[in-house]
């Protein structure tokens, strides 16, 4: 996950062709972060869980009717705009906390 964040954050600052709207992006990011944490915690080494993680991520993207490419380009767009990216991550944390309270 850190590698993905580093690569995407350091990409050129260009507007994505079809940036995913903030609310939808928050929903997707929340699910992506949770599934990444699950696999990192359970397996430790990326080489052990990468194929399974990719399948799980593809299911998340399919559920939200976006491609991996659309998600990654939108992630890059928001990451290149620190204020918006911070807002997205704060909303992801808020959403995660709300889900914990309602369980």
Question: Over which residues does each language-model region extend?
Answer:
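Compact alpha-helical subdomains of small soluble proteins
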Residues: 43-103
